[in-house]
Every structure is written in C-alpha cells, then in structure tokens.
Amino acid sequence: MSATAIPAATLASGEGIAERASSLDWDRVSRDLDTTGNAMVERLLSPDECRSLASMYPADDVFRSRIVMARHGFGRGEYKYFSYPLPEIIAGLRTALYPHLAPIANRWNEALGSDARYPAEHADFIARCHEAGQRKPTPLLLQYQADDYNCLHQDVYGEHVFPIQVAILLSEPGRDFTGGEFVMTEQRPRMQSRAEVVPLRQGDAVVFTVSNRPVQGTRGVYRVNLRHGVSRIRSGHRHTVGIIFHDAL
C-alpha cells in the first residue's frame, strides 16, 4: 500500500500534534526522566493514527532504507528509516516534542559537566547536525512478528546526539501480539544493572534516555548508562514508530 493511499483525515496535522504536545504534563515527564530515565505518555496517538502509520510499512516511497536486524546482529525483525520530506505527522512529532525536551537535555548536560547546549527549536538543532554531515533522517518504523526481538542498544548516529528520544507503540498488546515488551537497562557505577519494563498500550509513547543521564547520589552527581530493546514477540505482529531528534551520518 502506498503512502498516498492513506486517507489524510486519519493522520493528525502538524498543528494538531503541537496542540497535543502542549497539553502534556511536562513537569511529570521531567520528574520521571530524572527518576527512572523514562516517562510514559498515554494515548499520544489515536488508534486510527496508529493503524495508518503501521500501514505505511510496505510503501517504499516514504523510506530511505530497510534494515533486516538479523543480518547485523541487532536481533530479529526489521525496520525502515523514513526519508525527507518526512510524513507530516512524523515531522510534527519531532518539531512539537523537542522544545519541551530541550530544557531537560540542557539541564542534564550541565549536571554531567558537558558544555554542549541544545537550541530551543528543533530546526536549529537539525541545522547543526546537517552542518556536521549528519543529514540522514533517523525517525523509523519497526516491524516484528513471532520470535522477533530487538537487542539492547543505543541510537547514536554521530557527534551530535540529542539525549532523549521517543517510541510510540502502534499495535495493541493481547490483540495484535503477545510478548514484545519495551525493556530498558541502566548500568550504574560499582552496582549491578537495573532493568525496567514499560507497559505500553496502542498509541502510548515512552520518552526515554538515549545513552547517558545524570543521577544525584549521596556524594554528588554520577553518570548512568542506559540501553533499550524489545523482548521476544511470542505471537502476532508488532509495529512501533521511533522519533529520534538527531540525524545520522
């Protein structure tokens, strides 16, 4: 099915996504990110929007590349990177979510002793990426079936890395698939790693750490290292859209 065959009414406009983003409880998102490295946002997308995005997967004209995970040791399953120009809803999510996350990212960098600061608007950050040669769009659509999984990893694509990203589940657990939980691990200095499962439903988003975040300890701030992945799909099909704010080399 080609992307042009999807009724436009089933996908929100950039303005609609911006209104949704503005209405979120960003204070809670910030607290959750500081506490656990992730924050869940319920019903960011409607069921119709989820189905429409998932139905784009066979449409090669909206993607720049397809990755079969087993060929690279990434796990099992596959995903496709969207090409520029991004579908309006994907571009809208990037543009609308970034300004709320940039202050958190800047606060984290300051706590970690990094001089890097992120501009207030996503277009300015992307311009910085493109000037450094990171010109390939990174938003992606992932597809899994029974026995597929995604190994724990970090989505780092070049020198310029925005430290927070978003994944949105497009399928409904129990109805469309079983298994396939979103999993994060946090590696802490001189301690065993901590694992967490985020219980997403269709349309829910998880806002989470790309790689490093600061944690306040008894002797000051220390750095923890996070990875994310997806546990084995036991049955059915699972689609997810990933919103990464930096571009790739």
Predicted feature locations:
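Fe(II)/2-oxoglutarate
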Residues: 1-35
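A short glycine-rich, His/Asp/Glu-containing loop-to-beta-strand
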Residues: 39, 134-146
